[in-house]
Design a protein with these regions (language model features):
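Basic/aromatic-rich interaction segments and small domains that mediate binding to polyanionic partners
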Residues: 3-60, 68
Length: 69
C-alpha cells in the first residue's frame, strides 16, 4: 500500500544533500525511468518527484522519503 499520495511534499537525501519536492506520480508496475528499469509493485511503489529547486524529476522508494509540511 502507498505511504504517500500525489501532491505530498517530501524530502530525501541525495549526494548533494537534502532535496525537497512534490510527488507527481506513483508507480505500482515496473516502469522505465531515465533509461533504467524500475521495479515497482502495489506493496513497494516508487514515487516520481519533482524537485522544488530545479524542477528535475527523481524516482525513489517510500523508504527513502520523509513527508514534510
Amino acid at each position: 500500500m502507498s505511504d504517500y499520495t500525489k501532491g505530498d511534499h517530501v524530502e530525501w537525501n541525495s549526494e548533494a544533500g537534502m532535496v525537497r519536492g512534490v510527488i507527481r506520480e506513483i508507480h505500482t508496475e515496473d516502469v522505465e525511468f531515465k533509461g533504467r528499469m524500475r521495479r515497482c509493485s502495489t506493496d513497494e511503489p516508487q514515487y516520481e518527484i519533482e524537485s522544488d529547486k530545479t524542477g528535475h524529476l527523481a524516482m525513489h522508494k517510500g523508504s527513502a522519503l520523509r513527508k514534510i509540511d
